[in-house]
């Protein structure tokens, strides 16, 4: 099992589909990384040599923000929105949809379980 950016990749998958197991790397980014390092998409994770794993790790470390650093940055960005008191920050603080979705009937995921307001 190859360990890339602190994540154990599944050894039987093709490397282009295994790299997205790292938070912050999707399929497109995975292909860009493999092109830059010069590794075939068809190669399986268990077929990678130590040098190839090291090259992928080095390229990711130098060019991308992944895993803990990226999670921390996203959390800090959301906290900054809440601190400055902008509309998006208020929506985050209240636990409501941030991107303009309707909330009269939907948004159950963000709002949580329905609370009935009693009628007389």
From Swiss-Prot:
Region listing for Disordered, in residue ranges: 97-120
Keyword vocabulary terms for this entry: Ribonucleoprotein, Ribosomal protein, RNA-binding, rRNA-binding, tRNA-binding
Family: Belongs to the universal ribosomal protein uS13 family.
Cysteine pairs bridged by disulfides in the record: none
Protein name (Swiss-Prot/TrEMBL): Small ribosomal subunit protein uS13
GO biological process, one term: translation
NCBIfam families associated with the record: uS13_bact
Function: Located at the top of the head of the 30S subunit, it contacts several helices of the 16S rRNA. In the 70S ribosome it contacts the 23S rRNA (bridge B1a) and protein L5 of the 50S subunit (bridge B1b), connecting the 2 subunits; these bridges are implicated in subunit movement. Contacts the tRNAs in the A and P-sites.
A Gene Ontology molecular function term of the record: rRNA binding
Pfam families in alphabetical order: Ribosomal_S13 (PF00416)
Organism from which the protein derives: Nitratiruptor sp. (strain SB155-2)
Subunit structure: Part of the 30S ribosomal subunit. Forms a loose heterodimer with protein S19. Forms two bridges to the 50S subunit in the 70S ribosome.
Superkingdom: Bacteria
Any one of the GO CC terms: small ribosomal subunit
Database matches in InterPro entries: Rbsml_uS13_C (IPR027437), Ribosomal_uS13 (IPR001892), Ribosomal_uS13-like_H2TH (IPR010979), Ribosomal_uS13_bac-type (IPR019980), Ribosomal_uS13_CS (IPR018269)
């Amino acid at each position: 099992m190859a360990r890339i950016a602190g994540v154990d990749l599944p050894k039987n998958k093709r490397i282009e589909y295994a790299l997205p197991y790292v938070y912050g790397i999707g399929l497109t980014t995975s292909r860009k990384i493999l092109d830059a390092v010069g590794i075939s998409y068809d190669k399986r994770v268990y077929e990678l040599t130590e040098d190839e794993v090291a090259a992928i790790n080095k390229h990711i470390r130098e060019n991308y923000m992944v895993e803990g650093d990226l999670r921390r940055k996203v959390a800090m960005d959301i906290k900054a929105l809440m601190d400055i008191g902008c509309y998006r920050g208020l929506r985050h603080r209240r636990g409501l949809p941030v991107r303009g979705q309707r909330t009269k009937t939907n948004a159950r995921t963000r709002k949580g379980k329905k609370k009935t307001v009693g009628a007389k």
